[in-house]
Structure formats: C-alpha cells, structure tokens
Design a protein with these regions (language model features):
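Bacterial Sec-dependent N-terminal signal peptides
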Residues: 1-23
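Fold-level signature of zinc-dependent metallopeptidase catalytic domains
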Residues: 152-207, 220-230
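Active-site-proximal segments of metallohydrolase catalytic domains
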Residues: 215-291
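Short pre-active-site segment immediately N-terminal to the catalytic Zn-binding motif
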Residues: 191, 287-311
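Beta-strand-enriched, solvent-exposed domains that form extended recognition/catalytic surfaces
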Residues: 26-151
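Solvent-exposed loop/turn segments at secondary-structure junctions
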Residues: 183-186, 224-228, 282-286, 302-304, ...
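Catalytic Zn2+-binding segment of zinc metalloproteases
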Residues: 312-328
C-alpha cells in the first residue's frame, strides 16, 4: 500500500515537469500572433491572412497547453508540421460571430479584423482555425503554415509603458489580466491608474476570485487617447480615441464595443497578459465582452463595478447571459435543438454535460420561479435572450440581473475551473 502511494506521489511530482519539458521543446517564452480577416454574412464565412507578429511576452501557462473546455464559437490548433502532433489549442469567440445573428448580416457582407495568440513555435507548424457548424460541431475553415525563420514576421513595437496593479505571482502560474484605457487623455492617466486599482478591488470582492487573490496578476497600460470619452453615434458624438469604441454597437444603446481589434492587440502587447479588459472613460451605462477576445465597460457609471464583473464572466469564463427580457440585436443566438457550449445555460439537448447532477431529484423540472426555490440549483426557464426553451441554473445571478450581489453556484464553479486551468 505504501509503495503504491509513493509511486502516485512521484507521478504527481513529475507530471508538471513533463508539461514544462514539452513547452521548452516546442516553444519560446514569447508570443506569436496571427492577424487575419474574417468576413461573410448570415450564411457564409471566409478567412484571409493578414500578418505574423512577434510579441515579447508570453504570460500563459507552460503546462495547460491543450484546451480542455471546448468553449467558444471558434477554436484553433497549433500542430507540429513534421509529426502532426497538436502542441497548443484554445477556443474563442469574436464580434463577427455575434454580428452574423443580426438582421444586417442577412443583407450585406462585412469583414472584421481578428487574431489568435500562441507561444512562439521553435519549429515549423501548421495553424488550423475551426468554426462551429449549425449542429455545434467544429469544422476546419482555414489552415496556415508557419516557419519561425520567416523574415517577414513583424516585431511588435511597444510604445506604451505598463505598471503593476496587483502582481503576486509568476505569469506562467497566474491568471494575467491587462487593463487598457480607452478615451483617457494624457492628462487623465492618473485617473486611469486609480480606476485600475478600483476595479482590481472590485474583482477581489467577489467569489471565487477572492479565493485566488495570490494567483491573479493585474497590470495597466498607459496608452492615452487624443480625446476623452467614447462615440455615441445617435447623439452625433464622435471622439478621437485609441481603440475606436462606440455605444450602440449593432444598434443597441448599452452595447459598448470596438471592432478595431488590431488596435486592441497592439496595445495589449505592451504587457504580459492572458485576458484583455478595456476601461472606457465615460459615465454612460454600457459594456460588452466576448469569450477569449476582450471585455470592455465604463469606468464611472454607478453600476460600473457590477458591469465589470458581469462582462469579465463572459470574456474569461465563457459564461452566457442568463437574462431574456432586455433588448438585443441577435436573432436565435442559440438554436433550441443544439446544446449551447456555455456552462451556465442549457436547451436540455445534452443536459448531462451541464449541471444535471447538481439538481435535487425532488425538484420539479422545469423549476418554477418561486421563493421556496430561491437558493436551489434547478432548471429555470428563460436565459440566453430567450424566454422559452433555454434554461438557467438559478433564479438570479450576476449573469442575469444586478439585483443580486453574487454569482450562482454553477457560475462560481465555472470561473473556479477556468482560473485553475490558467494557474497550472
């Protein structure tokens, strides 16, 4: 018995070292960024190469190289060109995928600038990009060879300094968040620094982030805009800002986003990061976020703290909106005959992959929204922008309304799992 225990402990001891060995064998401790264009309409999509960019920092894990979540509308893989072995993979979503569900996408084509990042390969690789089909399955859409000896790899310039907000851990063993200013002028950089510390404390006020305070790094980048604020098109307000953010994205007032993702990446490259969060210097109510893409929200609205936490739930943990009675631009974001990939909503098509095992047998399904079930994990109809056919795990949660001050147990668990993936 003692011999078996010793063998198991030795296995646990050497397992992380094996991961580090694979990283060192195949990757440099810096970032390769693939910029590309992604276009199409409601029915079709196409890709076109833009540029290879080398960035100086790699903040990601050296052991969690292969995605284990299968979240996102898209995914990509880095495969060794000689053996075909998958060396690195991640899931993600983009603004283009949301636009495809709007009315406009049935009338015209649009093209968006996108990118994916990975540790810099030491040897030639093939990078494959995948997109989910109508059934929710990944299909390969684009493939590119990469050679680290390519003389046309752009060396990313670093025009802006970064500063530490909260940095207790080695980037390789931490979740690294970079805060980027939008609509802060040079004279407002002191305010941006204060906002960075304010929102860092906001993050650590919520479970489960407060349980990982020593494993989360937060940095800010001093990147000023020429003008203060953000665009509000319907009011004729246009600001000259670094990231071209605007209210009324897809015609929805509170949806504050930017389609200039290349500019976002160029600024983010100035610091080590896993996740990008953009703070917009405006008292308006708004924000937005997309999984493994970026999050963005206002700095001084009275609800700014909860907006920040809600939006980071989208971009970091892949959480879905659980509300269904607010204005959105999307049409059938979630087909009712397909199980959504997000961990906190279900169509019951494959409920066994979600929180089914956490629902008491005695609970009715669907679970009525009644006070006696206020603290019960159940199957509550309404979520993902639909009143019927999509279900959420809790009556209320920060992914639903701001009447509550906490995430539900299912969202907490999803956030916790994602943090653990980054820090190991």
């Amino acid at each position: 018995m003692h011999r078996l225990t010793l063998i198991f402990l030795l296995y646990l001891f050497f397992l992380p070292n094996k991961g580090f060995a694979q990283f060192d064998a195949f990757f440099e401790n810096k970032t390769l960024r693939l910029d590309y264009y992604h276009g199409g309409n409601a029915q079709n999509e196409y890709y076109a190469f833009d540029a290879w960019i080398e960035e100086p920092y790699w903040a990601g894990s050296h052991t969690s190289l292969i995605d284990t979540f299968q979240y996102g509308q898209y995914s990509f893989e880095v495969n060794d060109r000689e053996t075909g072995k998958t060396l690195y993979s991640r899931g993600y979503t983009t603004l283009f995928s949301e636009w495809q569900t709007t009315n406009e996408a049935h009338e015209i084509d649009r093209v968006f600038s996108e990118s994916v990042v990975m540790p810099f390969p030491k040897k030639p690789v093939i990078i494959n990009l995948f997109s989910r089909n109508r059934s929710g399955l990944f299909e390969k859409k684009f493939s590119l060879p990469f050679d680290p000896a390519d003389p046309y790899i752009i060396q990313q310039s670093l025009p802006y300094p970064f500063f530490d907000v909260h940095t207790p851990a080695n980037p390789a063993n931490a979740l690294d968040i970079v805060l980027i200013p939008e609509g802060y002028t040079a004279s407002e950089m002191d305010q941006f620094r204060k906002d960075c510390h304010k929102f860092a404390e906001e993050l650590f006020a919520y479970e489960p982030y407060n349980q990982f305070r020593d494993k989360i790094n937060i940095r800010g980048i001093e990147a000023p805009s020429a003008e203060s604020g953000t665009d509000i098109p319907v009011k004729g307000i246009w600001k000259n800002t670094l990231l071209d953010s605007r209210m009324y994205t897809f015609g929805v007032e509170r949806y504050l986003m930017t389609s200039n993702f290349k500019a976002v990446r160029n600024v983010a490259a100035c610091a080590p990061y896993d996740q990008i969060y953009i703070l917009v210097n405006t008292p308006e109510y708004g924000g937005g976020a997309i999984f493994n893409h970026y999050a963005l929200s206002v700095n001084s609205n009275r609800s700014a703290g909860k907006i920040f936490i809600h939006e980071f739930g989208h971009s970091f943990a892949g959480l879905a909106d659980e509300y269904y009675n607010s204005e959105v631009a999307y049409n059938e974001m979630y087909p009712l005959d397909v199980e959504p990939w997000e961990p906190n909503i279900t169509t019951l098509v494959n409920f066994g992959k979600k929180w089914q095992d956490k629902v008491a047998d005695s609970l009715p399904k669907p679970t009525p929204v009644e006070n006696k079930y206020l603290n019960a994990i159940g199957v509550y109809e309404g979520g993902g922008y639909a009143a019927k056919g999509i279900y959420r795990p809790y009556i209320d949660c920060l992914m639903n309304t701001f009447r509550t001050n906490s995430f539900c147990p299912i969202c907490k668990d999803a956030i916790r799992k994602m943090i653990e993936f980054y820090i190991h």
